[in-house]
Amino acid sequence: MAASPAAGAAAATVSSFVSPSSFSSVKASKPDRLRPARRAAAVNVRCVSSPPATETSFKTKVPRNANMAKLQAGYLFPEIARRRAAHLLKFPDAKIISLGIGDTTEPIPDVITNAMAKRAHALSTVDGYSGYGAEQGEKKLRAAIAATYYADLGIEETDIFVSDGAKCDISRLQVLFGSNVKIAVQDPSYPAYVDSSVIMGQTGLYQEDVQKYGNIEYMKCSPENGFFPDLSSVPRTDIIFFCSPNNPTGAAASRDQLTKLVKFAKDNGSIIVYDSAYAMYISDDSPKSIFEIPGAKEVAIETASFSKYAGFTGVRLGWTVVPKELLFSDGHPVAKDFNRIVCTCFNGASNISQAGGLGCLSPEGLKAMSDVVGFYKENTKIIVDTFTSLGFNVYGAKNAPYVWVHFPGRNSWDVFAEILEKAHVVTTPGSGFGPGGEGFVRVSAFGHRENIIEAARRLKQLYK
């Protein structure tokens, strides 16, 4: 049966939203050491804004969650995808280079995929098959995480909960905390902290004049304060979301700064949710874990992920550390309640992805991940050198895969549009990370080397 014209139009609309990125064909001056001889074409399907639903005459009697109505427009990255798709409709032949969403691009090292393939093949045998695993993660992987990242820090394998990624665990932690808490976030910060807080009913309405939600404490992080908040001016909150190295600014907190943060949490009886997703990018003596700070086990939870180390953005594997020393106000262990949340809401990470995690933590896997991180850090240097040569002030980059570029006095969405329109390069507007991001754009170093070089050329041409 032939498709109707309407159906064809709908299909065209959908395909424009889920089409793979179009990359430049410009080649680097030397071959990529991480690139395989041949690469299969990839189709990236994103969570993008849905087209308006066709009106129907029937409505259920189920009320909408009022908290969903508080959310502002679309989530940041789907909105960027929508604008990118619209740009392609306007310029169908454009070779768009994406330096926007922080998605990895380089192949997962063989030592890691071989471990996953071996586990996957074993599932086809009687002896190798396994069904549901422990919701908290496989004992061997939890032990390996503890030994690799928390040796001598007093963190045990039973404190570690393996997950399908840090972002998912952030929402599970929000379920754990409930709706009757007040949170603080760095400003700017990763949007998932604020949006999950809104969905949980922890916030007031969005205040358009200041671009903030009520009942959230926005801790300003700017070049003027070294991207670390003035804690003396921050009121008490129950939960403090803190990411270091920070997304989007790329700033890594020093040992002295984190010591102040832990003391601040202790003085106020708060819990820190410490996002260490980019810790492996730290190249100086900045702490890679909050638990390097004395007393942190009594006030902190740490989330982490293999996504940006091993290219697991699609594989999905991370972990959260909830120390047994961390207690609620009534003396009940936080870990016991989080374990109940995990057992209720989650059946455990894929056994194949966990096999990949063990591959990551083998000596060969750790070396391979270090090489991948080094590759992206080389990309970061190219981006930094490009903007610096053009006279821009740039921040971050040293300990993170993000470059935070300042466009004083300009609207960050306008800068995003200018770069997309004139250079066909996607960045991320800083205001999408909070009001403190206005006047900045985040440029991601996740990209193939030839695309980073070509993007640098276009940016130099645009702003020369």
From Swiss-Prot:
GO biological process: one example: lysine biosynthetic process via diaminopimelate
Assigned EC number: 2.6.1.83
Pathway in which the depicted protein is active: Amino-acid biosynthesis; L-lysine biosynthesis via DAP pathway; LL-2,6-diaminopimelate from (S)-tetrahydrodipicolinate (aminotransferase route): step 1/1
GO CC annotation, single: chloroplast
Cofactor(s) needed: pyridoxal 5'-phosphate
Keyword Transferase on entry: yes
Location of this chain's protein in the cell: Plastid, Chloroplast
Keyword Secreted: no
MF terms (GO), sorted A to Z: L,L-diaminopimelate aminotransferase activity; pyridoxal phosphate binding
Keywords: Aminotransferase, Chloroplast, Plastid, Pyridoxal phosphate, Transferase, Transit peptide
Record: residues binding pyridoxal 5'-phosphate: 132, 247, 275, 278, 305, 307, 316
Known catalytic reactions: (2S,6S)-2,6-diaminopimelate + 2-oxoglutarate = (S)-2,3,4,5-tetrahydrodipicolinate + L-glutamate + H2O + H(+)
Binding site for substrate: 102, 135, 167, 190, 247, 347, 442
Range annotated as the organelle transit peptide: 1-39
Modified sites of kind N6-(pyridoxal phosphate)lysine: 308
Entries under InterPro entries matching the protein: Aminotransferase_I/II_large (IPR004839), DapL/ALD1 (IPR019942), PyrdxlP-dep_Trfase (IPR015424), PyrdxlP-dep_Trfase_major (IPR015421), PyrdxlP-dep_Trfase_small (IPR015422)
Subunit structure: Homodimer.
Function: Required for lysine biosynthesis. Catalyzes the direct conversion of tetrahydrodipicolinate to LL-diaminopimelate, a reaction that requires three enzymes in E.coli.
UniProt record similarity statement: Belongs to the class-I pyridoxal-phosphate-dependent aminotransferase family. LL-diaminopimelate aminotransferase subfamily.
Name assigned to this protein: Probable LL-diaminopimelate aminotransferase, chloroplastic
Gene symbol of the encoding locus: AGD2
